[in-house]
């Protein structure tokens, strides 16, 4: 499987689960064969406001597995700036969350709530 120009090997991946897919868990999954891992759900706004916890959630480690950072939000400009900041940490790719139904995320228009606004979701991806 390929995501853009990144070749994914293996048949298993670690899903981006908040509170579960921390660095230690990603390292263990990579060690035991995950084709790629995705970091925890990270607030783009938190990253841009300088929140250290949010910045740490974006960190990738280098191993045999492909590592991705995941962002959520609803403001295209903030999402773009947070993605540019995430790129400085060298993830293999950046995942934009459009599936989280948690009130903390979707209740503020991010995650799965973006599926109600396809035009906005398109702007974020572009």
Predicted regions, residues:
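Glycine-rich, positively charged N-terminal anion/phosphate-binding segment
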Residues: 1-2, 17-92
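Extreme N-terminal starter segment of soluble prokaryotic enzymes
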Residues: 1-2, 6-12
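Short, solvent-exposed beta-strand edge segments and adjacent coil->beta transition regions
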Residues: 9-11, 64-68, 109
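General structural feature for long, well-ordered alpha-helical segments within catalytic domains
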Residues: 13, 78, 82, 117-120, ...
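A generic structural signal for short
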Residues: 13-14, 70-71, 113
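Generic beta-structure capping elements
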Residues: 17, 99-101
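Active-site-adjacent beta->alpha loops and helix N-cap segments on the catalytic face
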Residues: 45-57, 102-126
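Well-ordered alpha/beta subsegment
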Residues: 72, 96-99
């Amino acid at each position: 499987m390929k995501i853009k120009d990144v070749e994914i090997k293996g048949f298993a991946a670690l899903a981006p689960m908040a509170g579960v897919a921390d660095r230690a868990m990603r390292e263990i999954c990579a060690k035991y064969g995950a084709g790629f891992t995705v970091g925890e759900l990270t607030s783009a706004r938190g990253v841009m406001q300088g929140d250290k916890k949010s910045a740490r959630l974006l960190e990738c480690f280098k191993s045999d597995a492909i590592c991705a950072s995941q962002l959520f939000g609803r403001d295209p400009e903030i999402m773009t700036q947070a993605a540019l900041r995430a790129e400085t940490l060298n993830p293999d790719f950046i995942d934009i969350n459009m599936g989280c139904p948690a009130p903390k995320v979707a209740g503020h228009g991010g995650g799965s709530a973006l599926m109600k606004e396809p035009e906005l979701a398109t702007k974020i991806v572009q």
